[in-house]
Design a protein with these regions (language model features):
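Acidic, low-complexity/disordered tracts enriched in E/D and polar residues
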Residues: 1-31, 35, 81
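Long, charge-rich, low-complexity alpha-helical segments
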Residues: 25-85
Length: 85
């Protein structure tokens, strides 16, 4: 799973999908996770990085991560290549 190549994101969390013309705003943690996915990091790598940085537990991270992935899927921002996380 990866972010589609044509999707643009600003440092402030503004996402633009040129294919649909839609734009979205995400919070700073969402920006980090978005960029980790764009870099090709695995779920496990992202989990470790987020748990080290933020005061949260694995269950909360897991729920929030999958909610975020659901958002990305809903707005067709993901591209599925070799494998899905």
């Amino acid at each position: 799973m990866q972010i589609k190549k044509n999707i643009a994101i600003s440092e402030s969390g503004y996402i633009f999908n040129p294919s649909s013309g839609e734009s979205f705003s995400i919070n700073p943690t969402g920006v980090e996770i978005f960029n980790f996915i764009k870099e090709g990091k695995t779920y496990e790598e992202i989990e470790q990085l987020v748990l080290e940085k933020y005061n949260t537990d694995k269950d909360t991270f897991d729920k929030d991560y999958h909610d975020f992935i659901g958002f990305l899927k809903q707005y067709h921002l993901l591209d599925y290549g070799e494998k899905e996380n």
